[in-house]
Amino acid sequence: MTALMIQGAGSNVGKSMLVAGLCRAARRRGLTVAPFKPQNMSNNAAVTADGGEIGRAQALQALACGLEPVTDMNPILLKPESDVGAQVVVQGKRLTTTRARVYATLKPQLMGAVLESFNRLKATHDLVIVEGAGSPAEVNLRAGDIANMGFARAADVPVVLVGDIDRGGVIAQIVGTQAVLDPADAEMISGFLINKFRGDVTLFDDGYRLIGARTGWRGFGTLPWFPLAHKLPAEDALDIASGPATGGTVIACLTLSRIANFDDLDPLAAEPGVRMVMVQPGQPIPAEARLVILPGSKSTRGDLAFLREQGWDIDLAAHVRRGGHVLGICGGYQMLGRSVADPEGIEGPAGTTPGLGLLDVETVMTPDKRLTRVRATHAGSGLAVEGYEIHIGRTEGADRARPFAIVEGQNEGAMSADGRVIGSYLHGLFGADAFRAAFLRGLGIRASGQSHAAGVEAALDALADHLETHLDVTGILALAR
């Protein structure tokens, strides 16, 4: 038993959650198991203990394995900065920023780093469960591929193909994938499974048998929709919006065009007394919102312009006049100030963009990136806060004399004179249960008193139980070689 790979017949078929569940199931069998994703594209990154960054999904999968996340679990991370360009992070460290066409020429060189990381994990664990990216059916991207079949063949890892029945056409998804694949790539697929079924699973029995007959592949089962999916940290901002939509006090978060590291929202969204609303482009900020969150952004000045295009600057000013609260985290903190200057053109064309003016601070972008885990003390309550920083730029100004937190004896963040507008560089701050409860009380919201970490662990166990009930998990794990 060495490794197996989960690939999708399309994007967003549930690969990340399936890998997390399989990792927990394998761990409960007494195996040492590690997750691995050769290439991920996401602005929702996790900071590793060794000071690197990987996709947030792989950090959750590491938790399912009982491991600390390390950069080898996601050696290539692409962080989009525009519609055509992305930052390339290799084994946790920024390599370059490039356009898609240029990146295609880099991929063959990056396969070495991918295999190096994979082999390190393979040498120290009984099992490595690999997650593909997108779909191998995108055969126009096959040349130089390091994320799907290119990796599977280079590392000789068997593949299970996942189809998403919720979006319809799952027979065509799976049979069609086999039809367009190069025969040598198709031979890497050992079986298939169906994900996200709603209703009576037996109604798909004929379709399930048809897929097996057409492809010759072994079926590993049909998995019903996992009802506790919203209890797990979200990989996509839209996943947060898919949680319970009724009841609770409204906390609104702006869905910026380059939203990043929005895992700050997960502990809040899990609170029964909170209704998290992701404000979509073109929508007004809800007037009933008790708190408005400006999240992290991969392009602060670009998202400031985007925010104004939606009219959210006007909504925010009205929200503050009504006595509402505002929290800006990382890029959102930078936006709250009087200006954001980028004299070297690090995030785009050089220049200065006026901020929202809700905090008396100014930010200057600098080339050096701060990437570290943080233990802090909340300045207002004295409660412990843990999180991480992942940003460029320095923020200074009068409101920093009223800090959000104290980090190693230094002021962190800023607060307005009336205490209703707060900015901080600390991501993950609401994972601290006592602080989260105190913060919510300050908004007039009763906290559940539950441990967020314990809730995530329970959801991972429930996910593994769900897979064990409906899939041939033993058969899937037995494919590893």
From Swiss-Prot:
Keywords from UniProt, A to Z, are: Cobalamin biosynthesis, Glutamine amidotransferase
Question: Which is a GO BP term held by this UniProt record?
Answer: cobalamin biosynthetic process
- A Pfam family reported for this protein in Swiss-Prot or TrEMBL: CbiA
A molecular function annotated in GO for this UniProt entry is:
catalytic activity
Taxonomic superkingdom: Bacteria
Residue ranges of domain GATase cobBQ-type in the record: 248-435
- InterPro entries registered for this protein in UniProt: Class_I_gatase-like, CobQ/CobB/MinD/ParA_Nub-bd_dom, CobQ_GATase1, CobQ_N, CobQ_synth, GATase_3, P-loop_NTPase
Tell me which residues this entry annotates as catalytic. Answer: C330, H427
Instruction: Look up the record and name the pathway of this protein.
Output: Cofactor biosynthesis; adenosylcobalamin biosynthesis
Coiled-coil regions, chain positions: none
Does the keyword Cytoplasm belong to this entry? Answer: no
What does the UniProt record say this protein does? Catalyzes amidations at positions B, D, E, and G on adenosylcobyrinic A,C-diamide. NH(2) groups are provided by glutamine, and one molecule of ATP is hydrogenolyzed for each amidation.
Which family does the record assign?
Belongs to the CobB/CobQ family. CobQ subfamily.
Q: What is this protein called?
A: Cobyric acid synthase
